[in-house]
């Protein structure tokens, strides 16, 4: 089965139609109106009605809170794949809840119309359906949490809560991100989150930081500098903080070496 999603629309391509049996088939889960949905079809009808049955359902409804409800306008289009051909559409408004998680049409389309070679609904063994879901009302919890607002700061998508911190970094350390090489926004976001987190850690008082915190900050610093960030001030801050804890770090390292030696001895004994 092929699937494609864009905004409120979801395209479902049912492949190898002729080899399908009389049972049901499901599409992948998709999102519309911050809710999850799934299509259910009986492509060959049943033993009584010679129609293509098509439904939309709420997947994993048992995980939603008691009393949930949602109302949606649903449109199904059986796509005519011949250029200029007339597609067939059905639409309705439904309430979905704990008792009624599935709605649709038992007579979406005559099987004889689909199976006819000159009608354009079955091409190369594929039937194409477009579902459009407009969520009108939701009672209870949404499936998809709302993502926090992000604002563009010098080419970086920054959460609204961190705009002030990011502006401060660019004002104090101009050009610190001018040579970053990843162009993908997801990668840039990941690197930026690491820089902001590391900045917050190193702004704490030295006595508030453990050796583990410093080790993580060092690893993070190496990670982001390899991506092109120029973070001289963070490197300086890490060195200053680390030197004030040098004796403690040496003691921790000594303990680790003793533990490693003990583990090596245990392995030798077990072998």
UniProtKB/Swiss-Prot annotation:
InterPro entries: MATH-CC_domain_protein (IPR050804), MATH/TRAF_dom (IPR002083), TRAF-like (IPR008974). Residues 7-133 form the MATH domain. Keywords: Coiled coil. SMART domains: MATH (SM00061). Residues 230-271 form a coiled coil. It holds the Pfam family MATH_2. This is MATH domain and coiled-coil domain-containing protein At3g27040. The keyword Protein transport does not apply.
């Amino acid at each position: 089965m092929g699937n494609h999603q864009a905004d409120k629309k979801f395209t479902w391509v049912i492949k190898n139609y002729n080899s399908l049996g009389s049972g049901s088939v499901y599409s992948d889960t998709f999102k519309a109106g911050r809710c999850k949905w799934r299509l259910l079809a009986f492509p060959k009808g049943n033993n009584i009605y010679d129609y293509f049955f098509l439904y939309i359902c709420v997947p994993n409804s048992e995980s939603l809170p008691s009393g949930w409800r949602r109302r949606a306008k649903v449109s199904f289009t059986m796509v005519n794949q011949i250029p200029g051909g007339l597609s067939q559409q059905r639409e309705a408004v439904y309430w979905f809840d704990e008792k009624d998680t599935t709605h649709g049409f038992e007579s979406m389309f005559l099987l004889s119309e689909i199976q006819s070679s000159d009608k354009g609904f079955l091409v190369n063994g594929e039937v194409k359906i477009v579902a459009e879901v407009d969520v009108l009302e939701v009672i209870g919890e949404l499936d998809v949490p709302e993502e926090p607002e992000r604002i563009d700061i010098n080419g970086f998508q920054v959460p609204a809560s961190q705009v002030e911190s990011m502006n401060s970094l660019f004002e104090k350390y101009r050009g610190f991100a001018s040579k970053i090489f990843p162009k993908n926004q997801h990668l840039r976001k990941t690197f930026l989150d690491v820089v902001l987190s590391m900045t917050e850690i190193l702004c704490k008082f030295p006595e508030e930081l453990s050796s583990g915190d410093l080790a993580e900050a060092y690893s993070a610093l190496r990670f982001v500098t390899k991506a092109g960030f120029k973070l001289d001030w963070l490197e300086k801050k890490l060195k200053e903080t680390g030197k004030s804890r040098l004796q403690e770090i040496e003691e921790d390292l000594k303990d680790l070496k003793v533990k490693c030696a003990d583990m090596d001895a245990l392995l030798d004994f077990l072998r």
